[in-house]
Amino acid sequence: MRYINELREGDNVSEVYLCKVKNIAKTKAGKTYYSMILQDKTGVIDTKIWDLNNGIENFEQMDYIRVEGNVTSFQGSPQLNVRRLRKAREGEFAMEDYIPCSSKSIDGMFKELSSYVNHVQNIYLRQLLVAFFGDKEFVAKFKAHSAAKRVHHGFMGGLLEHTLSVTKLCDFYCTQYPVLNKDLLITSAICHDIGKIDELSDFPENDYTDVGQLVGHIVMGTMMIDEKIRNINGFPAKLANELKHCILAHHGELEYGSPKKPALIEALALNFADNTDAKMETFIEALAEESRQSGEWKGYNKLFESNIRATSHLGEKD
């Protein structure tokens, strides 16, 4: 298979890809064309069909399609211009080639996250974590889910990978700043994005659900936690409120989707850890995506509002 991350300007392509997005648009001259995003497990590529008259069969979003075309460059990014297209036939594709997945071991990451669960000393917080991570159905969804539609960790296992990274950062914060309530912070880190299992649909769609659009993962996760707490006898009300506050405030600012700003030091630490891992992974993914471009500098990145490049390695000549 010719994977998307292997495509370069000037390449001719005849391959099956997943049509993740399909929109009808018009040129300035009023001519109708299709603007699409095609996907495989290595990434996505902006795709256009300029001529809809010949060789273009009917297809829908989320169909697997065989395309013939050539790769060009538009504003510094690869673009696939399609000449011919038809829906892929049974046996022409394997779904595992089209679902992006973490490069790390899913089982290995979950085992490491479980060790943090097992080291929580507070009996109420431990019961809460066991209520989630002792549920086989929840665990299966949690391990397979992404952490985002596109920006960071938007791949199978991404939610687990992001959660583990945030938890490890919070564990470091607890060593560096002993004032932190470790059990509260670690529990908050492990649970901070659990709402995403219902905010985003399963692969291959990996798109926002109706409830995800209307409510969002922060509130959804808080509601999930509240439901579990109600089934734990004697769970202290103050501790419950502190935990829920950490979840509600973990995006840090109202404009970033948090209904509350951090009022506890643990909520502040969780916000920093979440933001750090999200931005680091976003930069890593941006460098990987831009690696297809020639030249040391990779161009302007909208998310970081800066021209970016990879760091030079020791021993390289200037």
What are these regions (language model features)?
Residues 17, 62, 166, 247, ...:
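Divalent metal-coordination and catalytic microenvironments
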